[in-house]
Amino acid sequence: MESIFHEKQEGSLCAQHCLNNLLQGEYFSPVELSSIAHQLDEEERLRMAEGGVTSEDYRTFLQQPSGNMDDSGFFSIQVISNALKVWGLELILFNSPEYQRLRIDPINERSFICNYKEHWFTVRKLGKQWFNLNSLLTGPELISDTYLALFLAQLQQEGYSIFVVKGDLPDCEADQLLQMIKVQQMHRPKLIGEELAHLKEQSALKADLERVLEAADGPGMFDDDEDDLQRALAMSRQEIDMEDEEADLRRAIQLSMQGSSRGMCEDSPQTSSTDLSSEELRKRREAYFEKQQHQQQEADRPGYLSYPCERPTTSSGGLRSNQAGNAMSEEDVLRATVTVSLETAKDSLKAERKK
């Protein structure tokens, strides 16, 4: 395979690659093919001028671009045909009635030139084997004798024009070498664009793998994962503790409410204190604790006797009413205090969960 000359695609110079792959050497350059195209353009201009240089057809012809070449590097079949005439070679359309009447088996030919739209490539026999020398491939593609006819038929189905190259091709090293040996191809060549895409994909995968390995070898990778896990566990435990505290607080509220309800039913109707402000609750708590402290100090004084006769004389009904009022006030203070504590705990829990 190394001895086979194979030019790969550059720009749109497929006609040049086709000719050089056919002749197995750097026989033509873009400049030489452009010169042939200009000669053809001049010959066409002279033929059009025969009808008169002032005619409408002639002026229209001059305004049109060349049909034999363009700026991209494309060359017409006329350019390729004239270039081959230099070497005594001739092109015949493969599916023309004239050639089909000859009933020649394709494997008995020496080479073909295939064209689809603006792309040209060569299929040539080197030694005793056929090769697809398409410049869009990464290398020559081996074609068996049995597959050659199917390959050409497939190209025709795809819209290709196929030309048979008639004449004696120049001698080349690959043809002489392959007359003595046969080559085997384990892997078929890929299209150049496909190969580039495959190489880019492999390069990207390799780069990703290297980044993963570098990250895995780094000391901070697993430490970061462990820190994240510990933070998640701590937040989970904190939420559970807050839920437990909320449940305990609700049970305390319920018990307090039950005790307050029983005391109220025995003495007087229940009065609501949930509408009290925080400042009023604070003042009531201070008054309650000052009263308790004052009573304790009085009880600790020497000679202090706690007899009912020393208290102001009131009726038994008035005494019960006063005691019930004091009891209600204390119970209301306790219940309101617990309610405020519960609301504060709920607000703290919501703020923590938002974080």
UniProtKB/Swiss-Prot annotation:
Q: Which residues form a coiled coil?
A: none
What GO cellular-component annotations does this UniProt entry give?
cytoplasm; cytosol; endoplasmic reticulum membrane; lysosomal membrane; mitochondrial matrix; mitochondrial membrane; nuclear inclusion body; nuclear matrix
Its localization reads: Nucleus matrix; Nucleus; Lysosome membrane
Tissues and organs where the protein is expressed, per its UniProt entry: Ubiquitously expressed.
Q: What is its main location?
A: nucleus
For the UIM domain, which residue ranges apply? 224-243, 244-263, 329-348
What is the documented function of this protein? Deubiquitinating enzyme involved in protein homeostasis maintenance, transcription, cytoskeleton regulation, myogenesis and degradation of misfolded chaperone substrates. Binds long polyubiquitin chains and trims them, while it has weak or no activity against chains of 4 or less ubiquitins. Involved in degradation of misfolded chaperone substrates via its interaction with STUB1/CHIP: recruited to monoubiquitinated STUB1/CHIP, and restricts the length of ubiquitin chain attached to STUB1/CHIP substrates and preventing further chain extension.
The protein, known as: Ataxin-3
